[in-house]
Amino acid sequence: MKREIMITDDGSKTIHMPDLNEQYHSKHGALQEALHVFINTGLEHFIEVSLSRKRNFQQNPLKILEYGFGTGLNAMVTALHDSKTPVEYTAVEAYPINEEEVLVMDYGKLLGHEAMYKHIHQCGWEKTHKINNHFLLIKQQKTFEQIADQDSYDLIYFDAFGPSTQPELWTVDIFKAAYNALKSNGVLTTYCAAGQVRRNMQAVGFKVERLPGPPGKREMLRATKSL
């Protein structure tokens, strides 16, 4: 399937797929979307709530599962976020981008860590890699349907192509597997705020919040596994 590089409104790049009329990140700002949806509303929220419950991350590292590794931007901004919180990050991707696309995306230069961005993409699949002193990365090449973890993760970044393009990635069955993969009080965050997506999340047991979205989107969703 044809893929093209697009410059988004905040100057960062994304990959555009003209056959689907879909982008890997928001055309209104790839970096802004990653920071708002996954860092500010996901990671920082979870850390704040966990610290209020006296969690010791040095003894119990934060475990993140990303649905849709894609360009590696979400992993990159997470690795750069907070050196006080050890993170074990598992990223699932069925169709990795190629080396040429990695170079053109240039997130390493944008964020001032070119070697780190190359390492994130060049390190092998299905193995654990130390990206920096507080961030471990495991990349798994498989489909969302193959995710079958149980009570394993604190936080899920759900970054699939939109439900209008690939509705099969936003079904009750997909969210049931995501719910099962989370620990109690685990959180799933996504840029999407579609009504059917919210209802599918609620159908499997998630408590779902509609929150202000990133630039170009009025709302986004955050779902919590509250037992």
Where in the sequence are the language-model features?
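Glycine-rich SAM-binding Motif I of class I
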Residues: 72-76
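S-adenosyl-L-methionine
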Residues: 103-149
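A short glycine-rich, Lys/Arg-flanked "PGG" loop and its adjoining helix->strand segment in the class I
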Residues: 169-184
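Conserved beta-strand signature within the Rossmann-like core of class I S-adenosyl-L-methionine
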Residues: 185-192
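Core SAM-dependent methyltransferase catalytic element
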Residues: 204-227
